[in-house]
């Protein structure tokens, strides 16, 4: 089994963790933006089938 030779420094660990967090934050911002545009009907890149409910 492969074993690392030296311990990873705290600063390197923090840098990698921050990169991972930044990617997650960006994904959440994009998802929220898409949800907002869908709810207002201003979406130009995502198509939703609208069901018209009319009472007769």
UniProtKB/Swiss-Prot annotation:
Pfam families: Ribosomal_L32p. The lineage of its organism: Eukaryota, Viridiplantae, Streptophyta, Embryophyta, Tracheophyta. Keywords: Chloroplast, Plastid, Ribonucleoprotein, Ribosomal protein. GO terms for biological process: translation. This is Large ribosomal subunit protein bL32c. Belongs to the bacterial ribosomal protein bL32 family. GO terms for molecular function: structural constituent of ribosome. The keyword Hydrolase does not apply. InterPro entries: Ribosomal_bL32, Ribosomal_bL32_plant/cyanobact, Ribosomal_zn-bd. Disulfide bonds: none annotated. It comes from Platanus occidentalis. The gene is rpl32. It is found in: Plastid, Chloroplast. GO terms for cellular component: chloroplast; large ribosomal subunit.
């Amino acid at each position: 089994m492969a074993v690392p030779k030296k311990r990873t420094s705290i600063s390197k660990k923090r840098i990698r963790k921050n990169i991972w967090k930044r990617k997650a934050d960006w994904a959440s911002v994009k998802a929220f933006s898409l949800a907002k545009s869908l709810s207002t009907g201003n979406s130009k890149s995502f198509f939703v089938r609208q069901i018209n409910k009319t009472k007769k």
